[in-house]
Amino acid sequence: MVRHPQHQILGVMTDFTLSAATVAPAIIQWQRVHGRNQLPWQNSRDPYRVWLSEIMLQQTQVATVLPYYDKFLEAFPNVQSLAQASLDEVLAHWAGLGYYSRARNLHACARTVMEQWSGQFPDSSQALESLPGIGRSTAAAIAAFCFGERAAILDGNVRRVFCRFFEIEGDPGLGSTQKALWQVAQHALPDTDQIASEPDSMQRYTQGLMDLGATICTRSRPDCKSCPIKPGCRALATGRVASLPNPRARRSRPERATHLLLLVRQGRVLLARRPDKGIWASMWSLPASDSKEALLQTWSSLLMHAESPLQKMAAFTHDLTHFRMLLNPWRVELPQSFDLSWFETNLDADYAWVDQDTIAKYGVPAPILPLVEASLSR
């Protein structure tokens, strides 16, 4: 049994002996009986499948991920097929999951594995962390699930569990709090004796921590009575479960207006590729400007040929991490006789005319897709 001295963590004295001696065994035993054991990526040591699930689950709930995971595997059953696909194909299959930088990193990572690792994922968390889009916690999860490595994870659910169990103060997103959480995460791992006697202990422990945070130690209304580690939970003992982790200081979310041009011609809609940096990078969306005036100026020579005046559609909002988008769509129809060579002459960005048969091939952001599909169905 590995014993750890007492450490000072943000002013809170925490006995790591308790974590090493009781937390890991309790979580492992609980996970065997009460944890989530029927998810499609479980019971697999295939790094590709585990990696895909870990990336999809970042900031996204399991129920949302499940249908996307199966469809993504149908399209890209292995790292080779993903690496050989175009970014457009990957974004099209990712559309709707949000946080699209994950899809771009996924594609880049697959190509790196093929080019630099001979098509095989590296078998250590340190090497995995060097790949595009794989951070410390994700690398540890893959290494634990696939290779049984004794590596600590610290996703959002696990941070909440440790903040409460060890009564750690501070915003979990701050560097000082993160450092403390990584320290306890490392010391709470199963000891080497347990790993030697139970070959699946790292897989069970890692999954158990995730399950505990997702189903028991939830953000609101946690089920403390069912928690396998409640005897040692400092927040439960002091009545502070509801106040930990400390909430982040609320910041006002600025609103940014964007004006969209829904250009329709014979039941087809014009899409333009977004820049390769910024919001919805490299995806296909409606042409956009920061103001109506800028939109009109850019498209003035085209709009004079429209069959009807520019039609204002209902505005709507879409929340992103740091700001709220106020989206103002404007619809206009072009006659069949309009010379399409205008687009080659006047547009700098890539563009495409899509219809009901081709829209699925393009990665269109979730807030924009209903606008496009509604016009295609007319």
Regions found by a protein language model. Name each.
Residues 2-38, 42-43, 211-378:
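Intrinsically disordered, low-complexity, charged terminal extensions of DNA damage-control enzymes
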